[in-house]
Amino acid sequence: MTQYDVVIAGGAMAGATLALALSHLTDNQLKVAVVEPYQVDTSHPGFDSRSIALSYGTVDILRRFQLWPSIAPCATPITDIHVSDRSHLAMTDISAQQVGVDALGYVVELADVGRIYQSLLQRCESISLYTPAAVDRVERFTDSVSVHLNNGETLQAKLLVAADGAVSNCCQQLGMNLAQHDFEQIAVIANVVTEQAHRGRAFERFTEHGPVALLPMSDNRMSLVWCLPPDLAEQVMLLSDEQFLERLQQEFGWRLGQMQKVGMRASYPLILRHREQNISHRFAVVGNAAQTLHPIAGQGFNLGIRDVASLAEEITKQLDDVGAYSSLMRFKQRRCGDRQNTIWMTTSLVHLFSNDYLALRVARNLGLVMMDNLSGLKQPLLRQTLGLVSR
């Protein structure tokens, strides 16, 4: 049985960020184990690489943990965000220049960040990486937790952290209740190329079927997230590339000129999942294991990184017992407001912008017009978009 201070189940962005943050904040004083079922694929997926958007606040967190310098060279800045409603004049724009920042956020490819984090984890003397391996069974005692892996090894620690995704095996084993709401939408994702260069612009276009988002990537690609009812999503997935681009053109419009190329498509159901409790005895939950949101406002991953930052800070306040109940309660209290507010905001946006009822159509267009002309109404949206929220 190998002894650690913290065992983290899940070595993707949330889990790896937590491990590296603990290393930085404690100057390698804590022994940390990261258990990850999947080894990083060293081959790059090329044109079809999947990506995520990091908010300004998330980048600030990564800077403080000394992680951003490694990620920055492969990040594409978002300098403008354009929000509009199809077939109506209402729109609002947010620009980095107006806000007084270099970028509103950045888009990074998961393949790039995965390789960077893998290298950082392997070079860190206080972190042990178990991969491919998964948590098979968890036993909790008064002062410790035993984590049994599917490769036969057993790890003992003061704290187990679940960062193992939306359908968290650790949370299921420990009976952490999961609340779910099916949005009855499917996200169709792909990378596309448009006639006009994106120039760092991100777009969110609301339609009667659901939102269409385009995020700027390297090599003038754009990352598409197209939210549709299940029947329409099935139709769209069966279209030829040419037909797909024509349908997308109809929904998005000509703001970027002609849609010229689309890569491999994928789809997944959009379901709100959130744990009612994010702590238990010797146990904490972060990232998608704590909550998985609709992508309408790009908040899910950034909310998870705020989980990670708050937990890392609380752990390092009590190094003699990193899994102490007092530390976990402080973490829970810090995260409560942000979690509730972000979940409420995201869900409200889905219901407001994903249908064509006349009353809601008028309301959302009026809202976009008012936000574009009244800075007082725009500020709350701006702060949430930038990730500048209390945690």
Task: Show where each model-derived region lies.
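FAD/FMN-dependent oxidoreductases across multiple families
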Residues: E234, L238-Y325
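C-terminal helical "tail/cap" subdomain of flavin- and related membrane-associated enzymes
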Residues: E313-R391
